[in-house]
Amino acid sequence: EKNTPDSSLVLEKGTVSDAYYELLKGRTLNTTIAYGVNDSNSYGTSYIMALTYVSKSKDLTKATGDEVTDIPSDLPKVTRAKNGKPSINMNGYKGSSKLVPQALIKGKGKEVTNNNTVKVKYTGWLLDGTQFDSSWDKNTTLEADTYSGGNHQVIEGWQQAMVGQTGGSQVLMVIPPNLGYGDTVQGAIRANSTLIFVVDILAAY
């Protein structure tokens, strides 16, 4: 399809090599660049690559959109700091045997399909309120595939919950054990745990 990228690239320091970053930064749309590679990362194989820029976007740093007001009252209550970092009150919630993807903020970006890579910030808790992971605390983002076999694999509950959401959204995910880690212990996550995530969708590629 015309002007539709075959692939996407996050261009920022730390995600690509310094040489690659300097080569690509500042280029305008419809520019084509050809370059040769023969270094320690090419496994002894030289090759030439050509890139054409057909579109670009600037990723968000936190969820941005309209607050959702019709949230079921029995779900955990989420509040946010000024920088967007979420906190949670479990509100006596006991979990669900089914996946619950509840938008808290409805973004105005593209709709996520089952063939996307999504850039997110997230925090995860157990039902007792114990936080077991947070990209906010690490000042990082995560890339997650909504399909199997990609380079950025996440649990099945994440894959299913993100499809149909929109860029800029913040989503509360209740993930039952069978769509999480099942009977496997995963660090601070006990076997057969229901997982609660709040996920900000910053971009979808």
Segments and roles (model prediction):
Residues 1-205:
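Cross-family detector of peptidyl-prolyl cis-trans isomerase
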